[in-house]
């Protein structure tokens, strides 16, 4: 039995209230390094709707029953009041998972975490076998000193503790989605269409050029097979990026079309109404259902607006990261680095450095005594004079020569190919 309890934000944010209108306008919270621009006031996001230890909180609970193989045996969702016994951090739980010890946790908490860890793995394996695509890409982690000065940029991967919560949230979202379908509730769905044919063909050509055999790329299982081919290779993270870029964008809509990346027919966002407006609408639809109130129909424009706000937030987050990376690398001008090729375009090569974790651009003109040909049909670069094909993940030595502050871009010059 798995219970996922989510703060009942809809109790405090009433439909058409000034607070609701502002939340709809923002659409989402924006997470930047070192700060957050919340969708809702902090009196809600950090207090009344924050699940604090030893305090009663209004929640909606998704109660799910499974067998030992992760098959669903029953589901119900209902309003609830919970009191948090202990508020754990990802760091604390990860230490416990890695060492088996944590002096902060009592024995009952340790037993619950051990049980949850095993069951989350069962759910994940079942989901992957169904065709959910299992990406594992690093994100930049910015390190600040006590005075707020940026002192490092590192690779950060999703921890096992994070994956545990992710699996439980995915399950709750999907089962609430099935319930909303059965009850014909008006909600915003999280739709993810399959990749466009042209994108698939370009990806297949890229895979062929890497001397790999691409599967048909018709289902998520095909993409997982491709990821398995490059598991543990230097090109693995860059192939994952290429796969991700070949995907269509997930968007919100008032009509359900399914989620390709999760191989889910019924999928919506239920678990984060504090930071996502579509989740808040799902909570409202559930309350209307329990109260036998006619629920307001949701127009297509509402889904478009939510998708637009999400896209704007992601652009803001990405450009802020690039700005911080560019400013941080000022101290490294003229320094040589070992890098990997992470991508190409007609003008040059994108290179990625592991530490500090940054990406930059090396124009073809920065490689002396060489001419390059970029074939956008086959997505490969050929050095004509040396007759070498450049590959994703290939090592190269570079020097940081310029910081383009207007475009937040790092420019590198070539030193040597490093095979």
Regions found by a protein language model. Give the residues of each.
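Conserved, carboxylate-rich catalytic/transport cores that coordinate ions
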Residues: 1-419
